[in-house]
A protein has these predicted regions:
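Residue-level recognition of tetratricopeptide repeat
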Residues: 7, 41, 75, 109, ...
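Structural marker of alpha-solenoid helical repeat scaffolds
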Residues: 2-4, 36-37, 71, 105, ...
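Short coil/linker segments at helix-helix boundaries
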Residues: 122-167
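Structural register within alpha-helical repeat arrays
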Residues: 14-17, 47-48, 82, 116, ...
Length: 195
């Protein structure tokens, strides 16, 4: 077993060198020559994912992180990297789902909590702004229209701001982030205004 492990380490080292010498050929070698159910295959695909992430080729990095996750679907660092690639590819909704999966596995994951906290905060800001703009268009609002506006604001606070607050509070438990603290202060101030 020790010999096999040393041999796998050596194979991974050679594979890493091959990637540096020619990533396209090494990638082709992976797809056509590597036995996908071999013990070393996940390590090789992880090398390709890491290489493409470093080179900022987010599409290929994403592809290889997804491939790696076929082997280790609950690997938190790989899920976080996959979510980063989804963001870089403009797939916010996919990143959202991936970060939510990360938090199911590791509730204190800093990156996932920061992303989700900021995502829901920005979503809440956008929804609040739209409600305010729509309400301002009404020249003389009736009580019913005002009540609808207040209910809409209340929903935004309960849902999006509430979620943002939960995630950002977790961030502060793990890491003293000034930005998360400032955002929480803004949410608190708005909550007081709404009451």
């Amino acid at each position: 077993a020790r010999l096999a492990s040393d041999l796998d380490d050596y194979v991974v080292s050679l594979f890493r060198q091959a990637i540096a010498a020619g990533a396209d050929q090494t990638e082709m070698y992976y797809w056509t020559q590597i036995e996908k159910n071999s013990a070393v295959a996940p390590r090789l695909v992880n090398e390709l994912a890491t290489y493409y992430k470093r080179k900022r080729n987010y599409d290929k990095a994403y592809l290889f992180y997804r491939e790696f996750l076929q082997y280790h679907s609950e690997d938190v660092p790989a899920l976080v990297s996959c979510a980063e690639m989804e963001m870089m590819r403009g797939k916010e909704k996919d990143a959202l789902k991936t970060y939510e999966k990360v938090l199911m596995l590791d509730a204190d994951n800093l990156q996932a909590n920061i992303f989700l906290g900021n995502y829901y905060y920005l979503q809440a800001e956008k929804d609040k702004k739209k409600l305010e703009e729509d309400y301002k268009k009404i020249t003389s609002p009736t009580r019913m229209q005002y009540a609808r506006y207040r209910n809409g604001l209340s929903d935004v606070f309960t849902n999006s701001y509430g979620k943002a607050k939960t995630y950002l509070q977790r961030v502060l438990q793990v890491f003293p982030s000034m930005e998360a603290g400032n955002t929480l202060e803004k949410i608190k101030k708005m909550e007081l205004e709404l009451k």
